[in-house]
Amino acid sequence: MQPLVVIYALLAYYLSRMGCYSVFMALQRPLTVQQLSDKLTVPVVDLLLPCRFCSRFLTYLELRQFDYKNLQLIWTDEDFVFACCSGCAYASAQFEFQQYYQVTLYGREIEQEEQRPVGQIYMRCQYCLKSLDLLEKLDICCSNQPFHKVRDHWKGRCRHCKAIE
């Protein structure tokens, strides 16, 4: 065993005896692929992260897209880590839209509904789940495109999915 692993295991054991282990692990869990790569000192290209939904390992491109979309790693109580592949992200977005759709607003109506500027409203792409940036939100507003409320969260179309259609 490597010395760091032994020290980490001893620290985890000590903290678990004190009832602090869950707090310790919560502070230590990386939320992005890059943070996980840095913490493990393993290049991203060498990471093997399974998809939580289909159990397939994400490709290098999918690992990079995962961080680009501002998605977060999924940790289990047993300290297993999962991500979400692109195919499952699209399927999940489609499923949520079909099952939990609430309302559609066009352009700047969203600001009136939420009582705050569009730049302060968090939203994701309705197709790929990418977190929308300010330019994407403003583009949707200016072109009078739809915003959809799904499961109490706003969705729009990102520049990549817009280019595909």
UniProtKB/Swiss-Prot annotation:
Residues in the signal sequence: none
Keywords on record: Activator, DNA-binding, Early protein, Host cytoplasm, Host nucleus, Host-virus interaction, Inhibition of host innate immune response by virus, Metal-binding, Modulation of host cell apoptosis by virus, Transcription, Transcription regulation, Viral immunoevasion, Zinc, Zinc-finger
GO BP annotations, alphabetical order: DNA-templated transcription; regulation of DNA-templated transcription; symbiont-mediated perturbation of host apoptosis; symbiont-mediated perturbation of host ubiquitin-like protein modification; symbiont-mediated suppression of host innate immune response; symbiont-mediated suppression of host type I interferon-mediated signaling pathway
Main location: host cell
Gene Ontology MF: a single term: zinc ion binding
Cellular component GO terms held in the UniProt record: host cell cytoplasm; host cell nucleus
Keyword flag Nucleus: no
Zinc finger region(s), unnamed: 51-88, 125-161
InterPro entries: E6 (IPR001334), E6_sf (IPR038575)
Pfam families: E6
Subcellular location as annotated: Host cytoplasm; Host nucleus
The keyword Transcription is annotated on this UniProt entry: yes
Protein purpose: Plays a major role in the induction and maintenance of cellular transformation. E6 associates with host UBE3A/E6-AP ubiquitin-protein ligase and modulates its activity. Protects host keratinocytes from apoptosis by mediating the degradation of host BAK1. May also inhibit host immune response.
Subunit record text: Forms homodimers. Interacts with ubiquitin-protein ligase UBE3A/E6-AP; this interaction stimulates UBE3A ubiquitin activity. Interacts with host BAK1.
Family: Belongs to the papillomaviridae E6 protein family.
Record protein name field: Protein E6
Source organism per UniProt: Human papillomavirus 22
